[in-house]
Each structure stands twice: as C-alpha cells, then as structure tokens.
Amino acid sequence: MHSKYNQRLREQGMDIDAIVNFINRNNEFHTKHFSKEYNLALTSAFEHFTAMLAEIFFVEKRTMANADPKLRAMMAWHAVEEMEHKAVAYDVMQKVAKVGYFKRCLAMAHVTLFLSYLTIRFTNRLLKNDGIPFGRRMWMMAKCRWWLFGYKGIISSHLGTLFAYFKPGFHPWQQEAIHNYDAWVEAYERTGDPMIAGAALYQAAH
C-alpha cells in the first residue's frame, strides 16, 4: 500500500523520493549511533504517536471532513491497524529489552520533536512541489497553527493521550480504542470492503 501510494504521489509531481531518502538516511543514522534498546524505545514511541494520530484523524469528523473518500478509507484502514498493534513494540521494550523509565521518556521526547520537525519540513516540500511561492507557504503553515494547537485544536485536544506515555506504570492498553472503532470492524467483517468500512468509521465520528 505504501509503495502504491508513493507512486501515485510521484505521478502527481511530488518529490516523494527526496522524502523517502531522508527517512532512510535517518533510520541508518539511528541504527548506527544509538543502542538497540534505545532504537526499540524509539519504535515504541513512534507506535504510540501514530496510534494517537489515528485517534486525531477519526474521533471527530472535522479532521477528515474534506478528504477524498478513497484517501479517507485508506487512512481509516491505517488508523485501525495502528490502534490494533499499538502495544506490540511497547511490550517487547518492557519485557524483553527491559528498557527503563528514563530511556522510555527520552525516546518519546525525541520522537515528538523529530515528528514535529518532519511535519514542517515535508509540508513545505509538498506545497513547494505544488508551485506555491515561499511567502504563501509560510503564511499557510502559520495560519494553521491555531487549528492544530489552539483552544480545542486538532492536536491540542489530544495532548493527554501523548503525555500519558510519560506516566510511570503506563501501558498502551490503558487507553481504549476510539469510540467508533467497532463501526469499522463491523462494516469490514460484513462487507470486506474498506471503502464501506472507512465511511462507517467516519460517519460514527463525533
């Protein structure tokens, strides 16, 4: 799915290879310069973050309201997948690698800063590929900050999910799946159609 999605972006003129190469270089850097335990802690933190993004995308209609139905269905599939395996890396980190509290929290802080940087960097690149001038790109990204981080913003409304990771004794399954998760499961089991399941997840959102 990821390869097909990236190819579709290439066909639309997006410089997706620069993004993929940047990610691959960063993965190689982390593998070379950090311990296996810390890399596992980073993986666990990434999994928690992506599970939180699944919540952000689909717990309320406003986030995906203007998305193409096919894109929304793909993102719904990915969101459900992230929610269902969100504890796997965490359990390996805790039970096998025996990563301690400090390293776990450090990895989450690392991931939060890194993903924030990537969001700005890649959004700017893709907008540039669309031919949008620099000044307008900066204005567009500045204008959306309130939508993301302001009062009842898309991200600020879910910071509790993120910060819960820093609690001693935390486990991902202490946080329940979003309220409309069962709507996706029921629709997919009944029809086998990700488009119908994605629509069901979206329609059941607040």
Predicted regions and their residues:
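Non-heme di-metal
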Residues: M1-H206
